[in-house]
């Protein structure tokens, strides 16, 4: 099981003060030493965390393969092609969202996605599509020529939070109208859906990754799904690094995934 560590929120901390530290570039050696397999960054259209300057230096200096998340905006795709990361993961974007909400609609944006994939492939860049665990979306992902899909685990993660933490006693409530019995049932159904989606993806010749909202409490059941080859995790690791340091935070996540 590969672990991609998303370092966007190192840039978020830097940008909170609008200065030049912490520098995301400094994380690269730590990721390598801690056993990460990949560095993941998201070059958003609004540049709210990682900037073009960051992306260029990371792609040029990373010891590890770089997975760049991006929208299907042609201008962004051109930037990705110029930077030549190992992989581009196409994701949906809304400027008003706090974080990526839901997967990319491959059916609705098939033409635009095909154009993006063709351009990326012409620049020797692998393509992954960040999608909900929906059978129609998975089937279409194979048809448009992607090598990989990344299953959106956000619903699973939020159900786990609602069932197992105090999140609904905070301002950041999720699934607050569900009782515990319903939450448990929905969590089981979502995990089964992720398993079934993985099976379908593999049958269609796609590599399957997963990510979004995964943390130290909920990662193990997803890591245990046969057929998932990679997890991309960011916020939880960066948040834990405030208390443990980045290297130890990655090591702990790696141990959970491998255990």
Curated annotation (Swiss-Prot):
Keywords: Cytoplasm, Pyridoxine biosynthesis, Transferase. The active site is at residues 42, 69, 212. 1-deoxy-D-xylulose 5-phosphate binds at residues 8-9, 44, 49, 99. GO terms for molecular function: pyridoxine 5'-phosphate synthase activity. One of its GO terms (cellular component) is cytosol. Gene3D superfamilies: Aldolase class I. It is an enzyme of class 2 (transferase). It catalyses: 3-amino-2-oxopropyl phosphate + 1-deoxy-D-xylulose 5-phosphate = pyridoxine 5'-phosphate + phosphate + 2 H2O + H(+). It is found in: Cytoplasm. 3-amino-2-oxopropyl phosphate binds at residues 6, 17, 213, 234-235. This is Pyridoxine 5'-phosphate synthase. It comes from Nautilia profundicola (strain ATCC BAA-1463 / DSM 18972 / AmH).
């Amino acid at each position: 099981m590969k672990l991609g560590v998303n370092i966007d929120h190192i840039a978020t901390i830097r940008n909170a003060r609008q200065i030049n530290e912490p520098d995301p570039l400094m994380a690269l050696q730590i990721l390598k030493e801690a056993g990460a397999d990949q560095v993941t960054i998201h070059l958003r259209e609004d540049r709210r965390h990682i900037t073009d300057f960051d992306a260029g230096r990371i792609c040029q200096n990373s010891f590890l393969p770089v997975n760049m998340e991006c929208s299907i905006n042609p201008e962004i795709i051109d930037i990705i092609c110029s930077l030549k990361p190992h992989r581009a993961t196409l994701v949906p974007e809304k400027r008003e969202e706090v974080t990526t909400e839901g997967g990319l609609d491959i059916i609705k944006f098939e033409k635009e996605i095909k154009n993006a994939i063709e351009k990326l492939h012409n620049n020797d860049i692998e393509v992954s599509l960040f999608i909900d665990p929906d059978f129609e979306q998975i089937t279409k992902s194979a048809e448009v020529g992607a090598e990989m899909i990344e299953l959106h685990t956000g619903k699973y993660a939020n159900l786990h939070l609602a069932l197992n933490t105090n999140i609904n006693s905070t301002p950041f409530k999720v699934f607050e109208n569900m009782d515990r019995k319903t939450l448990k049932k929905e969590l089981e159904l979502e995990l089964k859906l992720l398993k079934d989606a993985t099976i379908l993806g593999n049958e269609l010749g796609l590599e399957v990754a997963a990510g979004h909202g995964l943390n130290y409490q909920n990662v193990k059941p997803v890591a245990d799904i046969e057929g998932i080859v990679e997890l991309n995790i960011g916020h939880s690791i960066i948040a834990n690094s405030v208390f443990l340091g980045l290297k130890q935070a990655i090591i702990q996540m790696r141990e959970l995934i491998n255990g």
